[in-house]
Amino acid sequence: MLNLYGREFSSRLMLGTAQYPSPAILRDAICKSGTEIITVSLRRESAGGKQGGQFWQFLQELDITILPNTAGCYTVKEAVTTAYLARDLFKTSWIKLEIIGNADTLQPNVFSLIEAAKILNSEGFHIFAYTTDDLIVAEKLLDVGCRVIMPWCAPIGSAKGPHHIDGLRSIRAYLPDVTLIVDAGIGRPSHAAVAMELGYDAVLLNTAVAKAGDPILMAEAFSKAIQAGRMGYKAGILEARNVAVPSTPVIGKAVF
């Protein structure tokens, strides 16, 4: 079971809700994926008018755990304010904290992230910290009270998959008891499987499903890939070797 701030979930797939062709496809993709947690941007929800209200009603009808996020924030003040608004609107202390440092790469501003995390942790928030694959940053986030760290796999929406596996592997090795969720940059089900094979606890993705030719089928594919990756990790994956090793025993081999 996946344990997040004292709550247990059977699915290790978390799904974003943006960019889907229609609400109906989003709903069906969520159902097919088996996810129990979806992320929602407060900026989308509070975009105003009738559309925002309809989306909020749609979310309530899903009867699923909502993880609001601070997507689109560039400063500590923006992120903290957004977190407070999200807590009031969604009635949850959970917040996926993300602060962008560069408009082109969408790379997290880890310095502002740590500062905002310290503030929000002191105010009783349960933070899911979206960060880079830097071990030291992850440790600093733990120091200020975060219990769930979300290293990126690659830049948001890039679909490149794990581009720095050694970084992800290092975080997992040095933080064996911390809940780690790979977030951003996932493009294929195989990417998600790799993350799970590294020992990560879950995967959060959005674009790879939302922009797929068949989002519903892709949601199912990711669900199965994550399950397979987790099973492989638990079973004990064979380490790669630089030399060949025969798999067929030579005892009893005929000699001519």
From Swiss-Prot:
<feature type="active site" description="Schiff-base intermediate with DXP">
    <location>
        <position position="96"/>
    </location>
</feature>
<keyword id="KW-0784">Thiamine biosynthesis</keyword>
<comment type="subunit">
    <text>Homotetramer. Forms heterodimers with either ThiH or ThiS.</text>
</comment>
<dbReference type="GO" id="GO:1990107">
    <property type="term" value="F:thiazole synthase activity"/>
</dbReference>
<feature type="binding site">
    <location>
        <position position="157"/>
    </location>
    <ligand>
        <name>1-deoxy-D-xylulose 5-phosphate</name>
    </ligand>
</feature>
<keyword id="KW-0808">Transferase</keyword>
<feature type="binding site">
    <location>
        <begin position="184"/>
        <end position="185"/>
    </location>
    <ligand>
        <name>1-deoxy-D-xylulose 5-phosphate</name>
    </ligand>
</feature>
<comment type="pathway">
    <text>Cofactor biosynthesis; thiamine diphosphate biosynthesis.</text>
</comment>
<dbReference type="GO" id="GO:0005737">
    <property type="term" value="C:cytoplasm"/>
</dbReference>
<comment type="similarity">
    <text>Belongs to the ThiG family.</text>
</comment>
<dbReference type="Pfam" id="PF05690">
    <property type="entry name" value="ThiG"/>
</dbReference>
<keyword id="KW-0963">Cytoplasm</keyword>
<feature type="binding site">
    <location>
        <begin position="206"/>
        <end position="207"/>
    </location>
    <ligand>
        <name>1-deoxy-D-xylulose 5-phosphate</name>
    </ligand>
</feature>
<dbReference type="GO" id="GO:0009229">
    <property type="term" value="P:thiamine diphosphate biosynthetic process"/>
</dbReference>
<protein>
    <recommendedName>
        <fullName>Thiazole synthase</fullName>
        <ecNumber>2.8.1.10</ecNumber>
    </recommendedName>
</protein>
<comment type="function">
    <text>Catalyzes the rearrangement of 1-deoxy-D-xylulose 5-phosphate (DXP) to produce the thiazole phosphate moiety of thiamine. Sulfur is provided by the thiocarboxylate moiety of the carrier protein ThiS. In vitro, sulfur can be provided by H(2)S.</text>
</comment>
<dbReference type="InterPro" id="IPR008867">
    <property type="entry name" value="ThiG"/>
</dbReference>
<keyword id="KW-0704">Schiff base</keyword>
<dbReference type="InterPro" id="IPR013785">
    <property type="entry name" value="Aldolase_TIM"/>
</dbReference>
<dbReference type="InterPro" id="IPR033983">
    <property type="entry name" value="Thiazole_synthase_ThiG"/>
</dbReference>
